[in-house]
Structure formats: C-alpha cells, structure tokens
C-alpha cells in the first residue's frame, strides 16, 4: 500500500485547484496510462501523446470524477478515448520508430538479436490482436488488474474479459510457437 493520501482525496484536492495533488495522481498512474495507450496505438510516441492528452483532459474534468468510484478506471477510460481519437487523427504516418535494442554490455550479439526478434514478434502479435484484447492483456498481465476491474473500465461482463484474455493469449502463444519452431 502506498503512503500518503488516496486517489479520491487527491482528486478532491485537485478539483479544489491544488495542482500538486493532481501531479501526484499523474506520477501514480503515468505508467498504466502509457501502457494502455500503447495497447491502442502502434507508435510509442503516439502513446505518450495520448497519455499526456488524457491527463490534460482528466485535469479539465476532475470536478466530474465521482470519488466513490476508483480513480484509475475513470482516468484510463479518458486515456483510451484520447488514444482512439489520436489514432483517427493520424491515419497516415511518414516516419516509423525504431525501438532501441540492448544497450548495456553483457549479452552476446546473437542473444541480443534473438531477444530483439522475440520482442519484435511479440509486438507484432500484440498489434495483430483486436484493440479490446490488447487492452485486456495489458491491464491484466502488465497492470495486474482483476477481471471485474477491467470489465468495469471497458463496460463488459467479467466472463467476456476472461474470454478476451483467453483468445488473446492463445493467439500470442501460436505466434510465439511459430517463432520457436523457426529457431529450432
């Protein structure tokens, strides 16, 4: 459990105009916001932009937040909407990002190449999933959210969350099994 005021208290203080309180909320939820935006968007820079736009929109709408409800789903719903809006606005890209590979010395070039290949395949497999499955995988596996929390955020029943997670993992497993067969 983190120390200091809880999210509801910080949101109340932010609604009263205390920008430092909102800054604490940003610090607490920035990682989750970026990861969820990344599940919707193809480019890391776009995900960062969407997360920032989501925080700005949340700051502007903080007085509409219901402190009886958890803060993170309210915020991430805004971030997802911002990511979807950004995706619609940026239908054509002229540049592509090149992810950095291993920077620290240690692994051999062959090991680094294998890790980069696996990372590329995993990113490609995630990108090939439907948006809702990507969001479910990110929230469940990367953020540790419960099925009910994810369902509440996305407006779907728990059983649908479980089903989406199952189908997403199966698709990822098939993609990665193909990679292992190629490497053997």
Segments and roles (model prediction):
Residues 124-127, 131-135, 139, 143-160, ...:
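Helix-turn-helix DNA-binding module
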Residues 1-3, 15-24, 34-53, 182-184:
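Short, charged helix-capping/linker segments at alpha-helix termini
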Residues 49-56, 69-81:
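Structural recognition of an alpha-helix C-terminal capping motif at a helix-to-coil junction
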Residues 33, 37, 62, 66, ...:
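Hydrophobic-face residues of short alpha-helical interaction/recognition segments
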Residues 15-16, 42-43, 53-70, 89-91:
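Sigma70-family region 2
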Residues 86-106, 113, 183:
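Short, basic/polar amphipathic helix motif occurring as a linker/hinge flanking DNA-binding modules
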Residues 101-127:
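Acidic, proline/glycine-rich intrinsically disordered inter-domain spacer in sigma factors
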Residues 26-44, 61, 126, 171, ...:
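Amphipathic, Lys/Arg- and hydrophobic-enriched alpha-helical face
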